Each structure stands twice: as structure tokens, then as C-alpha cells.
Amino acid sequence: MLPIDVTDLWPLSRDLLIQILEDRCSDRFVCERIWERLGYREVAAGAWGAGPETPAEWSEAFPEAPQLIAERPASVRLTRSIAKPHKQLLKQQLAFPGYRIGELYPRRTRRATAVNWLLAWLAERSEPLMEQGPLAPELPAPSNPVFGHPGDLPVT
């Protein structure tokens, strides 16, 4: 368990996680919710770096906060960091059926991984998922999910 002061973290809620799954917020917002829970801290305007609470396996591989949606190595590490008992939380807690064949894009599947990781983070701390809470700045779903929202980095 990371010694992170949870009062400094953006609150997680069912509504927020659905907003992420429905691609109605920026990739950057999604990354920031995970970075703060991994102990990364904003070190300059828009730049995040590993902090003293960042697990060594993350800070050594990614001294600067990784682009979890845009970059495959970071997404793979995030997937592998979810403990086996928590791999199905997306389906169990949010009744998420997955994406249909025509909806399968790396950005979307990586967002689903991010949501599952956030659910696992709560589960590891025995914290409940709130029904409602603050949402991300609302964006319309992108017209082309491959490219995402204006400002989202290209997926590699």
C-alpha cells in the first residue's frame, strides 16, 4: 500500500469512471488520476515526475509520468500491475460489457484498463466506489476515436 495522503487525490466515483469509459474527457485527465495514485507529482506546469511514494518499478522505468493511454509500454505495465483477483472489476462493479468489434481502438481499450486499475486501487484499500462525485471537464466523444480529443497524444 502506498503511503499517499488520499485527501489530496481526485475522488473516484461510478459516474467519473463511466465518463472515462465513454471517452468524454481527455486522456491527460485519465493519466493524472493514475499518476497521483502512483505517487507522481506535478513538478512544473504540466510536467509530472516520480515522487518518493512512487513504487520503484514505476519510477525506474518511468522517472517522468508515463503517457498511459498514448504509449504501449506504459499501458502494458499498467495492465500487468493489476492483481489477478482484480482483473474483472470492470465487469463486476460497472457491469461493463466491453467494446464491440467496431469500437475496438487502442485508446478505448487502454481507457478500460485505466478504469480497471483505478477500481483495483480502491479494492486494494478496501475503499468503496462512490456513486457520484466530481467529474472531469466534459468533452463530447471524439468524432474519430483513433485520434481522440484535441490535445490527446497520438497512440503508439
Specify the residue positions occupied by each region the protein language model found:
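Conserved, aromatic- and glycine-enriched, well-ordered alpha/beta core segments
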Residues: 10-100
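Low-complexity intrinsically disordered segments
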Residues: 59-156
